[in-house]
């Protein structure tokens, strides 16, 4: 698979929706993840990321404007031991709870399907990073309707063992803007990963569509020690 520019990929798409990037820093020292949310409606744009323990949760920026919390208020990031879970919905909790009971990432996600927001049927995208004694691997998943048919759920898992320095994979909910919104197709995109946490955070944030971007979370985890650094950027301040 040809590696593409994450900056170009983001800049060329006004509405990828929600997106997860997972990979390894160019110097090979850090496990890297980014999660962003975008919005077209007032309800969807009325959000910020806030820290919550070792993870984050979404929160209404202006509680008086919150019309429907069901699919927009959740914990995108949670940490279970040496595993970091990143998703675009409350399946974060499903993965956390079932993996805590010794089930696998894939088994946990078999209990879930795409979101019930007809006619988009937004895919549920998820990622998990596992860091153990200086080793690092990750997996990504997408649960989506069968070409807009809600009677059938298609589940795909992609696992990346011993990832290469300077490479990441990018998955997002929608191919592009539209009505209804077309679900992501294919396997996660191979993108280059350069620079430190601040450089990478700026690259993602600056290339997301100005009108539609809402919040961004970035974390660099030291593969040797498990210690991490986090950046959160919110459009609403």
PLM region descriptions:
Residues 1-237:
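Conserved short alpha-helical segments that host acidic/polar catalytic motifs at enzyme active sites
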């Amino acid at each position: 698979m040809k590696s593409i520019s994450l900056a170009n990929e983001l800049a060329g798409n006004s509405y990828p929706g929600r997106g997860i990037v997972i990979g390894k820093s160019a110097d090979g020292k850090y496990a890297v993840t980014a999660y962003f949310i975008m919005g077209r409606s007032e309800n969807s744009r009325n959000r910020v990321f806030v820290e919550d323990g070792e993870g984050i949760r979404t929160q209404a920026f202006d509680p008086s404007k919150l019309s429907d919390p069901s699919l927009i208020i959740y914990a995108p990031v949670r940490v279970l031991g040496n595993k970091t879970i990143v998703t675009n919905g409350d399946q974060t909790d499903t993965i956390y709870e079932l993996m805590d009971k010794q089930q696998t990432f894939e088994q946990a996600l078999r209990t879930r399907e795409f979101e019930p927001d007809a006619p988009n049927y937004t895919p549920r995208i998820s990622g998990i990073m596992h860091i153990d004694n200086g080793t690092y691997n990750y997996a990504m998943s997408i649960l989506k309707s069968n070409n807009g048919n809600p009677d059938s759920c298609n589940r795909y898992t992609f696992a990346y063992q011993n990832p290469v320095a300077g490479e990441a994979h990018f998955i997002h909910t929608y191919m592009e803007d539209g009505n209804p919104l077309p679900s992501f197709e294919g396997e996660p995109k191979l993108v280059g990963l350069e620079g430190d946490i601040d450089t990478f955070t700026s690259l993602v944030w600056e290339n997301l569509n100005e009108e539609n971007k809402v919040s961004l979370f970035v974390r660099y985890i030291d593969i040797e020690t498990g210690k991490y650094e986090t950046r959160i950027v919110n459009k609403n301040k």
